[in-house]
Amino acid sequence: MSLSALESTINSAFDARDGVSTSTKGEVRDAVESALELLDKGEARVAERAADGKWSVNQWLKKAVLLSFRLNDMSVIPGGPGQASWWDKVPSKFEGWGENRFREAGFRAVPGAIVRRSAFIARNVVLMPSFVNLGAYVDESTMVDTWSTVGSCAQIGKRVHISGGVGIGGVLEPLQAGPVIIEDDCFIGARSEVAEGVIVRKGAVLAMGVFLGASTKIVDRETGETFVGEVPEYAVVVPGALPGKPMKNGQIGPSTACAVIVKRVDERTRSKTSINELLRD
């Protein structure tokens, strides 16, 4: 089935999703399974970057993931600690894998790393004990450190460092919402959170504990310019606060959290300077 035929079948099935269940067979099930296989192999992805830097979302692939929850029944998933099992609808990406399959895939998966089927992991990625949800895309030579989460359909670029305990938000619903996107060569500091479709552009550095959502103000302290929903290329970002506004009683109100761009660097500086030096002010 061609990509256009897959898209058409999945769109039609999603419009009539109340009639899709574990007993559904034939074209709809085949189309959804084919779409998930394309995602799993990295041959299709939920979001793609155009030459002008704009990202477009393939909504039909998100629909395929959502339909899979209706199509697949709950089942026992073995491999838990102490020979325990899990109970879910989505199997592990590594189900049935042996040495040859791992060598062919070319990435490291440390014990405790969980990747759900339909997530793509590229060559030379290192997965510490972490969680990668379905539909996500993790590109080459990226590190996903311990206790970090890459949410459903999130797009992670090449040579990204996702530090310990980071949360990269996922998105399946609402359909019109875009996924979180971390472009190439970014550094995401420990315990940071990037959610609600925020885009972190190429080479940006987030210090430890930066929290970014769709409405978070990202203020350039040199120019005063404010960004929302996107971190500019090669920006170095730390947690900050905006001053409170006067309340009705005349007192200054509470401050509000924001993120602050403390500097911007070029590609050459970014590649030759340690993260600690970039964050030192």
Curated annotation (Swiss-Prot):
One of its GO terms (molecular function) is 2,3,4,5-tetrahydropyridine-2,6-dicarboxylate N-succinyltransferase activity. CDD domains: LbH_THP_succinylT. GO terms for biological process: diaminopimelate biosynthetic process; lysine biosynthetic process via diaminopimelate. It comes from the Bacteria. This is 2,3,4,5-tetrahydropyridine-2,6-dicarboxylate N-succinyltransferase. The keyword Transferase applies. Its EC number is 2.3.1.117. Homotrimer. Belongs to the transferase hexapeptide repeat family. One of its GO terms (cellular component) is cytoplasm. Pathway: Amino-acid biosynthesis; L-lysine biosynthesis via DAP pathway; LL-2,6-diaminopimelate from (S)-tetrahydrodipicolinate (succinylase route): step 1/3. Its main location: cytoplasm. Substrate binds at R108, D145. Keywords: Acyltransferase, Amino-acid biosynthesis, Cytoplasm, Diaminopimelate biosynthesis, Lysine biosynthesis, Repeat, Transferase. It is found in: Cytoplasm. It catalyses: (S)-2,3,4,5-tetrahydrodipicolinate + succinyl-CoA + H2O = (S)-2-succinylamino-6-oxoheptanedioate + CoA. It is an enzyme of class 2 (transferase). HAMAP family: DapD. Pfam families: Hexapep_2 (PF14602), THDPS_N_2 (PF14805).
